[in-house]
Amino acid sequence: MALSQVSASLAFSLPNSGALKLATITNPTSTCRVHVPQLAGIRSTFASGSPLLPLKLSMTRRGGNRAASVSIRSEQSTEGSSGLDIWLGRGAMVGFAVAITVEISTGKGLLENFGVASPLPTVALAVTALVGVLAAVFIFQSSSKN
């Protein structure tokens, strides 16, 4: 059984690279490790277990504290609707959440819970086409009313 060594790398720059001594191989018979005396304190964040970002971040703001005003305009309102579309949307969201919960809890797909073990391609295509056509019809009808 062969042992594999996992290593992480870290890119860094040295301000005084001319003072860097040549790297030496510590033990040539075992796995190859390079020892650089000047870099003994610098380790990768993965190997040392430290967070990827430094804990103390100093951020400087340019300019003063300017307040930016943002205006948001919505074209939709619930005042003119009958409320049916709102409740249908809420029902669809709750139904989707229930379906996902049932799939996670049972470990079976939605069709398997209804007794269909393998999906039927023609039925799936027909249902998809029907839903697509009905969605397009409802979208075009609602846009013609406005």
Swiss-Prot record:
GO terms for cellular component: chloroplast thylakoid membrane; photosystem II. Residues 1-73 form a transit peptide. The keyword Transmembrane applies. Keywords: Chloroplast, Membrane, Photosynthesis, Photosystem II, Plastid, Thylakoid, Transit peptide, Transmembrane, Transmembrane helix. Induction: Present at low levels under low light conditions, but accumulates under high-intensity light. Induced by UV-A illumination. Fades out upon wounding. It is a multi-pass membrane protein. GO terms for molecular function: chlorophyll binding. GO terms for biological process: cellular response to high light intensity; cellular response to UV-A; photosynthesis; response to high light intensity; response to wounding. Its main location: plastid. SUPFAM superfamilies: Chlorophyll a-b binding protein. It is found in: Plastid, Chloroplast thylakoid membrane. The chain crosses the membrane at residues 84-104, 120-140. Signal peptide: none annotated. May be involved in non-photochemical quenching, a process that maintains the balance between dissipation and utilization of light energy to minimize generation of oxidizing molecules, thereby protecting the plant against photo-oxidative damage. May play a photoprotective role in the thylakoid membrane in response to light stress. Belongs to the ELIP/psbS family. This is Stress enhanced protein 1, chloroplastic.
